[in-house]
Amino acid sequence: MELQMTAPCLLGLEGLVAEELRQMDAREVTAENGRVFFNGDQAMLARANINSRFAERILIVLDRFTAVTFEELFQAVRRLPWSEFIGSTDTFPVKGYSISSTLHSVPDCQKIIKKAVVESLKEDYHINWFDETGPVHQIQFSILKDQVTIMLDTTGTGLHKRGYRPESNAAPIRETLAAALCSLSRLRHYHTLYDPFCGSGTILIEGSMLAANVAPGINRNFACDRWGFVPEAAWKQERARAHECIKTDIDFQAFGSDLDPHAIELTAINAKRARVGQYLHLDTADIADFNPQTERGTLVTNPPYGERMLDIREAEWLYRIMGEKFNPRKGWSYGVISPDEQFEKCFGRKADKRRKLYNGMIKCQFYMYFK
């Protein structure tokens, strides 16, 4: 079955998501703000869930239409082939949002969509009551300037939940963003990665998984596992393919340090859970003592800053030390994510390249130095 799907993502990562989907052989890939649309079959759906490093989830797009009245919304939703996805005992909650639209009340839209789905299923299953005790089929809707998109969430718990980080430090970076920073830094399997503010190890772990080509979702489950819509053989085949693509004989190392001994302990535990502990070298150390011993290195880091853990004055003092330690040298690149507009001034050098990204709700710049 040919499906249209969409992969929501953090703002600024649309290009990375589109490119990884193309590499997975997705068809008709098009990027919009905060999401990427693509086409494929059920195997592609499984492949995207298992392999995407940068998307937040994978949704099936059931329809896109214009609606300015509740009747138009009801009839358009009712016409959709819900019984192809939702069984007679399955659970189907509804959530979504409305922006700059005539139908602006989200609770009212939820009720109308739920009612329309129920009426459609009543006709197909010839029953009047749904216990909703079976697998969850999360229905999502978006209404933007009267344009409605109706979707089914196939992922469940967000794709950033890889399963290796049940514990984290006070200000963790999102896994999808950490993977993106490593990719934007052009990290390769023969590089040496550094993070002198490693926290609970997310950048080091995501970098190691990227270098070894370990699929982020290879060891987790998804909402649509229990639907039966994707054949079990497709899941087995896609997981087997992901295992075959893992690189085991690579010349890769990742060095991490942090001032907090507990953070180093967390990093070691999380790396072991992610099965990349063999690549990591960890130490409790201050940034003032940063003194790498390798000739080449790719440094990617998310230092503490005013809106997270330090006040602005402390953060800018930290940036000055970083500027002294991260000096230009052949074979080295440095990537620092920060929301501080004064970062370059404090660091002492203009970035060779900048990219606007969001760390949670905080607007940041990813400052890249490679010359």
Residue ranges: model-predicted function:
Residues 173-292, 307-308, 312-314:
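Conserved S-adenosyl-L-methionine
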Residues 2-135:
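Non-catalytic nucleic-acid substrate-recognition regions in nucleic-acid-modifying enzymes
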Residues 9, 258, 338:
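Short beta-strand/turn micro-motifs composed of small residues
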Residues 286-371:
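C-terminal catalytic and target-recognition region of SAM-dependent MTase-like enzymes
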Residues 97, 144-184:
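Class I S-adenosyl-L-methionine
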Residues 99-102, 158, 304-308:
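A short, flexible beta-alpha/helix-coil linker loop
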